[in-house]
Design a protein with these regions (language model features):
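A short, charged/proline- and glycine-enriched loop
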Residues: 1-2, 233-239
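Beta-strand->loop->alpha-helix junctions that form or flank phosphate-binding loops
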Residues: 37, 164-175, 265-272
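ATP-dependent carboxylate-amine ligase catalytic core
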Residues: 2-17, 23-108, 116-139, 150-154
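Internal gly/pro-rich beta-alpha loop/helix module
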Residues: 123-231
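A short helix->loop->beta-strand "cap" motif at the edges of active sites that frequently abuts
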Residues: 110, 165, 312-316
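Phosphate-binding active sites in nucleotide-utilizing proteins
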Residues: 238-301, 305-310
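Cysteine-nucleophile active-site neighborhood
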Residues: 290-366
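Hydrophobic/aromatic ligand-binding patch that stacks against planar heteroaromatic rings
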Residues: 25, 103-104, 159, 258, ...
Length: 367
């Protein structure tokens, strides 16, 4: 199975930019490509989905068994799978490699392209590259330099060859495709004006400065991943309503697919369009950025009332992140204005100015 992983030295080095550039370039070449994200990330897969026009998937070595990781990789792969890493290559749970990009590359036996941000560096970038290559046994095969000039790339490419790595190109500083930050790391793809134009511009830069042909060559991995196929039994005949729009868009594609494979009919509705909850046996309110649309959500009383009636009638409800905020009496928007919400949960919720908790957490039920 053809596959390649794009990893980074650290968060913010340009992994997502490079990944989207490569994905769009492959799509423009009419290649059937599928994309994956290492770890529990909703936002980066939405960028991938915007680029390739199909679902993007998560591979999480902390939450999944090795079998499940390789099963889902094989199940969802096209002619080539492009896997984007998370944080720095070796960064995992609680100062270990558990859940890290490195661990995923080992489990899936995938060749790795390391993205290095050269802003403020020239030759020092190679000390970083050499350190990553020699720190642990790994599958790092090539390097792409971000924020680098063409002149300096010639020197760095020679240095790469000296330590046995393939120089795969670079991206200059491209101001026209800057992706601004949000409180979870990146804005959602749907919030960026002219996103497809930006992605195609990235692809043009990739074709000019990145060796796409060599990436395809490296991806020709004849090492089969080992796994036991998961047997999924269709044993339910239920209808599950899922809030799905710009405000509620944080879902793992494989979770929804699994529910369908087990017999559930997934029916999506939009709180932003004031759609009522359809008749259902279960309700899912996913995460997102509802505080950006709090004024609209407050005005859409049809949805508010139907969600309240649904939950109060005893229909099981899973609400997380923004969906959990939506169930409260009051939600504070980005400008600290208060808006009335569903009211099932007493109290007010708001977004703080900084992350309160980030990463995995393990809990044990007391009852």
């Amino acid at each position: 199975m053809r596959r390649i992983m794009i990893a980074g030295t650290n968060s913010g080095c340009g992994k997502t930019t490079v990944t989207c550039a490569v994905l769009q370039a492959l799509v423009n070449r009419k290649i059937n490509v599928s994309s994956f994200k290492c770890g529990p990330d909703y936002i980066d897969p939405m960028f991938h989905k915007t680029v390739i026009g199909t679902a993007a998937y998560n591979l999480d070595t902390y939450l999944m068994s090795n079998d499940a990781v390789n099963y889902l990789l094989n199940k969802n792969s096209g002619d080539i799978a492009v896997i984007e890493g998370v944080m720095g290559f070796y960064d995992g749970f609680s100062f270990t490699e558990k859940g890290s990009t490195h661990e995923l590359s080992e489990i899936t036996d995938t060749d790795v392209i390391l993205v290095v941000n050269c802003r403020g560096m020239s030759l020092s970038a190679m000390a970083l590259v050499k350190g990553f290559k020699e720190f642990r046994k790994n599958n790092i095969n090539g390097v792409i330099f971000n924020n680098l000039s063409e002149k300096l790339y010639g020197h760095l490419s020679e240095e790469c060859r000296k330590i046995g790595l393939v120089p795969l190109g670079f991206l200059p500083n491209i101001k026209d495709v800057q992706i601004s930050s949000r409180h979870l790391g990146l804005v959602t793809a749907g919030e960026i004006d002219g996103i497809k134009d930006k992605m195609n511009l990235l692809a043009d830069y990739a074709e000019k400065y990145i060796d796409i042909d060599k990436i395809l060559e490296i991806s020709e991995n004849d090492r089969d991943t080992k796994f036991t196929s998961l047997e999924i039994t269709k044993k339910y005949n239920v209808k599950i309503a899922v809030a799905y729009d710009r405000a509620f868009c944080f879902y793992y594609e494989d979770n929804l697919n699994l529910l369908s494979e087990m017999g559930a009919e997934i029916v999506k509705f939009s709180p932003l369009e004031n759609e009522s909850v359809p008749q259902c046996d279960g309700l899912i309110l996913g995460g997102g950025y509802p505080e950006l649309y709090a004024d609209i959500l407050e005005k859409n009383t049809g949805t508010l009332n139907s969600v309240k009636e649904c939950v109060e009638s005893g229909v099981p409800c899973i609400a997380e992140c923004g969906g959990f905020m939506y169930l409260h009496e009051i939600m504070e928007d980005s400008d600290k204005n208060e808006h009335g919400m569903v009211g099932i949960i007493k109290g007010k919720c708001r977004k703080t100015d900084r992350l309160q908790r980030f990463g995995y957490m393990e809990m044990t039920a007391n009852r």
